[in-house]
Amino acid sequence: MTQGKVDVLLGLQWGDEGKGKVVDVLTPLYDVVARFQGGPNAGHTLEFKGEKYVLRSIPSGIFQGRKVNIIGNGVVLAPDLFMAEAKDLEKSGHDLHANLHISRKAHLILPTHRLLDAAYEAAKGKGKVGTTGKGIGPTYTDKISRTGLRIGDIFDRFEEKYATCKARHEAILKSLNYTDYDITEVEKTWMEGIDYLKQFKIVDSEHEINNLLRAGNSVLCEGAQGTMLDIDFGSYPVVTSSNTVCAGACTGLGIAPNKIGDVFGIMKAYCTRVGAGPFPTELFDETGAKIRDLGHEYGAVTGRERRCGWVDLVALRYAIMINGVTQLILMKSDVLDAFDTIKACVAYKVNGKETREFPFNIEEGVEPVYQELPGWKTDMTGIISEDQLPKAFVDYIHFLEEQLDTPVRIVSVGPDREQTIIRK
């Protein structure tokens, strides 16, 4: 029997690279799409048949017919938000019940986790991380401290387990002087979400995914956020609470490392970041504002303005190394169509010394070293084949491939799945 293949798709920057669209483009090549980490703090935006969708917890393969979609054990799930997301998709004619499978080991985001999120941020004052307030961090905290609730718990003495967790959280909130809240209505909707979850296939996803592989099925593992937000390798402490890197696909789905084949790394032709945290190539001038406006750079979940800057090749080399990236996917190339000159950060100056390696701390004393390249000054949004690409843009791709020592396999020139060029 032929063993199926496992490929991984993940972001190489600070998230928002365009993973949702790429998964939707790649899913025809796979039998299974599996989400391996994160929660409803990250939104994957897709445009499908003229309609825009933002997926927060549900894998992006849900639009592709009878593909199996798996929410893995590494994901944290908010039942109320999941219910709202699923019902919106059902209204659009997408039936999730047959094709969506959820790991019983995935952890639940409780209403009090969101309160803890707000309380912890308030207590940090000026040092706050700038979370989305969805309760992600406190949920992963409970997971690591072995006090969390998992989806498998909803079938056995759940009310008792929930009451214990809630009481513990409320004691912490009291110690933080965070007592002005009423979660009655939120809790009611949350419990409705728990009942709604019971309608789906709750599975031991690690067994299911390995059985599917043994049967010869191909699997695409879908990450959320980006490498530079990884809890271990990102710009700590302003990071997320899970492993967004390739290794997270193994621990978040129960897949052995030797099963991993291709690792697709997604990058924008420039760089963005939402919220607080260091960002060496950030632009504070009209150029940054122009990139934001042309790229519609606003958070899919929060609506917050994204900070914009030139592409950072130091951070990208680091991300490619950590993930073992085999192929690059270049997104939002068309956003730079109007620029006379493009800049790329090829090195950092750290305390006066030039380096191509990503340092321990990029908060202070890091100065980007730029190389300028000519812009292509061509509207690429209507281009449908590689041979139509302007020479200056092809030169930009070759420059990236040389700097990053990794081939660019796919180029996106617009938000629709049709605006995608697969290079030979």
Features from the language model and the residues they span:
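Non-transmembrane, aqueous-exposed alpha-helical and coiled segments at domain scale
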Residues: M1-K424
